[in-house]
Amino acid sequence: MPESKYRQQTIRAPRGTVLTAKSWLTEAPLRMLMNNLDPDVAENPHELVVYGGIGRAARNWECYDAIVDALTRLEADETLLIQSGKPVGVFKTHDNAPRVLIANSNLVPHWATWEHFNELDAKGLAMYGQMTAGSWIYIGSQGIVQGTYETFVEAGRQHYNGTLAGRWVLTAGLGGMGGAQPLAATLAGACSLTIECQQSRIDFRLRTRYVDEQAATLDDALARITRYTREGKAVSVALCANAADILPELVNRGVRPDLVTDQTSAHDPLHGYLPSGWRWEEYQKNAQSDPHGTMQAAKRSMAAHVRAMLAFSKMGVPTFDYGNNIRQMAKEMGVENAFDFPGFVPAYIRPLFCRGIGPFRWVALSGDPQDIYKTDAKVKEIVAEDKHLHHWLDMARERIHFQGLPARICWVGLEWRQKLGLAFNEMVRCGEVSAPIVIGRDHLDSGSVASPNRETEAMRDGSDAVSDWPLLNALLNTASGATWVSLHHGGGVGMGFSQHAGMVIVCDGTDEAAARIRRVLHNDPATGVMRHADAGYDLAVECAVEQGLNLPMVAATQGKG
């Protein structure tokens, strides 16, 4: 690890209303950058790693310092450009332009491989931004809890008559993303057994109440699961072991879970998936000394893992990929039928995307949890009829531990995002909350990503790999006046397999902010409806007509349907 990528320093975002930068529009990205590296948020903050293998917030510590300095000095009509975690320029733009534009990990397609990226990374020329690590809007595991919860609930609807009570989920991975799984299963009414190879991650999830219990052995874990499912209790159990060993063993024993998925960091075989029989320290050492051999060893273990998932699927157990590209890795190692079980988006989530419904999130820059609780109440007031959403907000308040600055996520669609943003802005203006609020989202959204093995898998018109859509999303959010906009490559599924865009907008209580919110929080989800309508989804066409979208090649939106 080059010296500049390691620093023994604790970073925490400022709280309260005293500004470090010149305005809230530059204070917000500054605080959110720092929040991504808060030790309560980031997986490895001393190496700038936020989550997802090597998903970083800045390329190295010199770049981090330069970004902080640039943001503190940035004027109201200037825009800072970030190239793979490095601040490369400040340009005069205008008041309604984004204050920061970010491009992370983007490579010309022919060279878009982990091998080439790792060479660039070693030379200090690139940075893997994951999705919300390099775009400074990660909020800890809460950021994926509701999406995972919605997935499990929909699986219960489809396979188990609408309930997961008395059922159990088998999965693996308790990192920044995977750590959401046990809590999401509990909230959905199911027991869960999550395999994790690092004890430190289990300890963190136990401490933050994302996991209820740890089993000492596989037999102990199965005994607990049997007892809790028989009693109808939703309890999450973690086991420190390697999934590539445990899943085949469960198949051999004839154990039958009720749902099977996986959220290990399989997208990154060099840093994110421990080969069977290896210790973590050995894995890290070999990643430096023999990267090719290490990647092959990891992928061989992934192949064993996927063969076990295929066996569960053949038993009739609902089995799905949760977006980490493990099927692709297994296929590259000779598992030709790796894609015989589906990804979670085509299986459970796409109808939501057709209506622009996705991971709307917001953060209280004040650091005061009461500001989030007040916005929770505002969401219930505005989206008054959605009892499912109200139930989520109640459960989130009860069970979800804030990591860093207080934040909330809830999945809402095109119909509601603009209304909620304007309401939050008014709360800031009236002093109902104590400081501005930032609104952002995961790049995993309906119109902001092209990822043929995840979000755009099995599109109706075959356009899975067309990546014009996230580029258009980023361009439109820039034109609409988002506070910062990001365009990344490789998030979630690794190099060569995705392109995706993000946006964040600040609610500072001003009329100017309201105008930007009105544009951004309509246009951003509208691109998702547009993308799915263009692909021929009737639900998306209906939503486009309801919301008055003008889509020239979709006849129904032109009064010709």
Curated annotation (Swiss-Prot):
GO-annotated molecular function: urocanate hydratase activity
A Pfam family that the UniProt record links to this protein: Urocanase_C
EC number: 4.2.1.49
A single GO cellular-component term on record: cytoplasm
Any single GO BP term: L-histidine catabolic process to glutamate and formamide
Required cofactor(s): NAD(+)
Lineage: Bacteria, Pseudomonadati, Pseudomonadota, Gammaproteobacteria, Enterobacterales
Keyword Lyase: yes
Domain of life: Bacteria
Cofactor note: Binds 1 NAD(+) per subunit.
Main subcellular location of this protein, as a coarse class: cytoplasm
Positions with a binding annotation for NAD(+): 52-53, 130, 176-178, 196, 201, 242-243, 263-267, 273-274, 322, 492
Family in the record: Belongs to the urocanase family.
Catalytic function, reaction form: 4-imidazolone-5-propanoate = trans-urocanate + H2O
EC main group: lyase
Gene3D superfamilies the UniProt entry points to: Urocanase like domains, Urocanase superfamily
Pathway in which the depicted protein is active: Amino-acid degradation; L-histidine degradation into L-glutamate; N-formimidoyl-L-glutamate from L-histidine: step 2/3
Compartments where located: Cytoplasm
Protein name in UniProt: Urocanate hydratase
